């Protein structure tokens, strides 16, 4: 049984290295590593040059190495060839891969050409991995006591591969180990400093055995010792929205599904971000009825049904307007819950009474309504993200109150 469950990630792609495209894969892989008991020690981003890829491969020290990108059909997709050469393995054509890829191409009305034939070649002794949402199959290559997992660079393809039960089984087979789960607690509504203050007397926090990963509106706690879970649950209660690293929007969608409830949204300063976040979750159509982006007052009146007197007397950024927006969208879209966001995201538009970052967030249910005023700090995007996450959490907590 291997005790050193260290891991590294090598990101290949000059478009990422040059800043033309943002990497979206490290987070997904890092979450998988933690949930399966691995420790991520290093991340490298390199271009598509053969010698740079080979050097990066040979310098790795971890037991598990993820390599993403460069296994497609273009000329600069060189990863499989460089890996085979670096570890002195011949590339072999997989007949099974040819059959699988031919069927995928047939469904897309695409001919199987020599270009696609290259996707079916793997280093000797490599284990093929299915790619449910793409053409290029991933593979695992064992080199002495280490395993190289070679994945495509497309984020949604990587996520689909990591979610396969067979993927986890293959990794555990390579390491001859039982599943060793880490824990990712998600806390919403508390700042990083507040969490640290609450946990000052816990030895694991003092010794740096718990990592805090803050982002706008929420903080993730990463811990390996599950014995801490009862204590943290007692201290943080409903501030915890996940014990296994899910996104807040995933938790909200699943909660709505379990309660057989629906929601709809009315957004001003967030410009559709709340609706986008909710609909990014698979299965959201079961519980999300729709949303309206109502920037101008006349649209709030005409399309949503907000009272003109409310807007005239209290303004668009107000507690009363937010409440009406939530109630109106709930009734208009025949939902169980209506969520509304109205505010000043900046950088202009603020005043002494309502500075930039002022946001009113309302949730309306059949029997209860809540409106909360916030003043978020940060740039325009941070304010909008913070508002969306606050709205999701307010909905989550109100749903939980109804099932007590």
What positions do the PLM features span?
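Short beta->alpha junction loops
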Residues: 42-52, 375-378
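Flexible gly/pro-rich beta->alpha loop and the following alpha-helix that scaffold active-site loops
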Residues: 67-93, 236-245
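Short alpha-helical segments enriched in small residues
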Residues: 102, 118, 229-404
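Proline/glycine-rich low-complexity loops and linkers
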Residues: 51-58, 78-173
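An accessory alpha-helical subdomain
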Residues: 143-228
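Short glycine-rich anion-binding loops that position phosphate/pyrophosphate groups of nucleotides
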Residues: 14-15, 70-73, 153-156, 218, ...
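Glycine-rich phosphate/diphosphate-binding loop of Rossmann-like nucleotide-binding domains
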Residues: 2-43
């Amino acid at each position: 049984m291997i005790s050193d469950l260290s891991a590294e990630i090598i990101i290949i792609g000059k478009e990422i290295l040059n800043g033309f495209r943002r990497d979206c894969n490290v987070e997904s892989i890092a979450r998988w590593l933690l949930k399966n008991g691995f420790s991520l020690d290093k991340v490298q981003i390199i271009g598509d040059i053969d010698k740079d890829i080979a050097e990066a491969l040979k310098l790795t020290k971890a037991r598990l190495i993820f390599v993403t990108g460069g296994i497609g059909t273009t000329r600069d997709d060189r990863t499989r060839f460089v890996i085979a050469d670096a570890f002195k393995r011949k590339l072999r054509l997989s007949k099974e891969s040819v059959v699988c890829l031919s069927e995928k191409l047939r469904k897309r009305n695409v001919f199987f050409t020599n270009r696609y034939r290259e996707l079916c070649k793997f280093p000797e002794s490599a284990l093929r991995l299915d790619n449910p949402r793409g053409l290029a199959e991933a593979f695992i290559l064992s080199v002495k006591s280490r395993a190289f997992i070679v994945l495509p660079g497309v984020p949604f393809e990587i996520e689909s591969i990591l979610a396969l039960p067979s993927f986890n089984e293959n990794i555990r087979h390579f390491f001859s180990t039982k599943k060793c789960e880490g824990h990712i607690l998600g806390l919403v509504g508390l700042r990083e400093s507040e969490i640290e203050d609450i946990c000052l007397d816990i030895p694991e926090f003092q010794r740096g055995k718990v990592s805090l990963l803050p982002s706008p509106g929420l903080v993730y706690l990463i811990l390996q010792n599950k014995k801490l879970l009862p204590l943290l649950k007692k201290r943080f209660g409903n501030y915890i929205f996940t014990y296994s690293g899910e996104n807040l929007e995933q938790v909200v969608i699943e909660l709505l599904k379990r309660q057989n409830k629906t929601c709809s949204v009315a957004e001003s300063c967030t410009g559709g971000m709340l609706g986008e976040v909710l609909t990014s979750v698979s299965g959201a159509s079961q519980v999300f009825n729709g949303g309206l982006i109502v920037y101008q007052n006349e649209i709030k009146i005409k399309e949503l049904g907000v009272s003109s007197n409310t807007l005239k007397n209290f303004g668009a950024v107000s507690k009363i307007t937010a409440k009406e927006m939530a109630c109106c969208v709930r009734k208009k879209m025949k939902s169980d819950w209506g969520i509304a966001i109205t505010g000043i995201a900046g950088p202009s538009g603020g005043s002494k009474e309502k500075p930039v970052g002022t946001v009113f967030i309302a949730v309306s249910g059949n029997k209860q309504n809540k409106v909360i005023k916030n003043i978020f700090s940060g740039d325009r995007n941070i304010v909008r993200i913070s508002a969306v996450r606050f709205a999701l959490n307010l909905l989550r907590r109100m749903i939980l109150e109804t099932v007590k």
